[in-house]
Amino acid sequence: MIAIPAIDLREGACVQLVGGSYAAEKVRVEEPLEALKQWRRHGFRAFHVVDLDAALGKGSNADAIFQLTAYERGLTFSVGGGVRDSDRVETVLSGGAEFVVVGTRAIEDAGWLADIANRFPGRVVVAADVKGREVVTRGWTAGSHRDIREVLAAFEPLPLGGLLVTAVHKEGQLSGVDLPLMREVASTSRHRLYASGGVTTMEDLRALAAAGAYGAVIGMALYTGRLDASAVAREFAG
């Protein structure tokens, strides 16, 4: 399993939110490139970038994203947040990202998801953000009334690059991962699982690896120093 630092962008800065609430910003790094450089010094090579403003339809951090993806050859970026049309998918993938992460429209429009997945096989990652068992959309602000297992079943035939499953109720809480949820996804789906939400300790990472996760996205625990970044990178940087 690989550990993947999160770089969440808001108003041009790198931030961390508690519980998926845009009113609960706990960490802010004014220059996202400095965050990337910090994680590179520890040895990380894969990064998950989210444009929080675009996710809410309130702007874009496209310039900051390009700075990140252009920084160094050989790094792997997954980029998401507000990717709701095919032109944006193409822009992200041609701009240096290995994977594009699609959430809201992928959940709401199966035909569109099938189209982009087949146009870009292995490069589309679907974000399934989960509160309890319900998949939520629109920057975690809207419910879909669909259970995670129902949503997973719809993705099985598609040539996806993976599933990014975020336990929103654990996000930024430093309270541990939702291991039953991640075990269920790993055992139910044939796609690579990228687990997110609540990673706090090395034991959390080892448990996710044992559960079958391909990758773990880590945010708050790295930014606050709760996790030793060097130790994580030594064991899980890939």
Swiss-Prot record:
Keywords from the named record: Amino-acid biosynthesis, Cytoplasm, Histidine biosynthesis, Isomerase
Pathway(s) the chain acts in: Amino-acid biosynthesis; L-histidine biosynthesis; L-histidine from 5-phospho-alpha-D-ribose 1-diphosphate: step 4/9
Compartment(s) of residence: Cytoplasm
Keyword Amino-acid biosynthesis: yes
Any Gene Ontology biological process: L-histidine biosynthetic process
Xref: SUPFAM superfamilies: Ribulose-phoshate binding barrel
Chain segments annotated as coiled-coil in the UniProt record: none
Active site: 8, 129
Entries under InterPro entries matching the protein: Aldolase_TIM (IPR013785), His_biosynth (IPR006062), Isoase_HisA-like (IPR044524), Isoase_HisA-like_bact (IPR023016), RibuloseP-bd_barrel (IPR011060)
Major enzyme class: isomerase
A GO cellular component annotation in the UniProt record: cytoplasm
Gene3D superfamilies: Aldolase class I (3.20.20.70)
E.C. numbers: 5.3.1.16
Catalyzed chemical reaction(s): 1-(5-phospho-beta-D-ribosyl)-5-[(5-phospho-beta-D-ribosylamino)methylideneamino]imidazole-4-carboxamide = 5-[(5-phospho-1-deoxy-D-ribulos-1-ylimino)methylamino]-1-(5-phospho-beta-D-ribosyl)imidazole-4-carboxamide
A GO molecular-function annotation: 1-(5-phosphoribosyl)-5-[(5-phosphoribosylamino)methylideneamino]imidazole-4-carboxamide isomerase activity
Family named by the database record: Belongs to the HisA/HisF family.
PANTHER family from the UniProt entry: 1-(5-PHOSPHORIBOSYL)-5-[(5-PHOSPHORIBOSYLAMINO)METHYLIDENEAMINO] IMIDAZOLE-4-CARBOXAMIDE ISOMERASE
Record-given protein name: 1-(5-phosphoribosyl)-5-[(5-phosphoribosylamino)methylideneamino] imidazole-4-carboxamide isomerase
Lineage: Bacteria, Pseudomonadati, Myxococcota, Myxococcia, Myxococcales
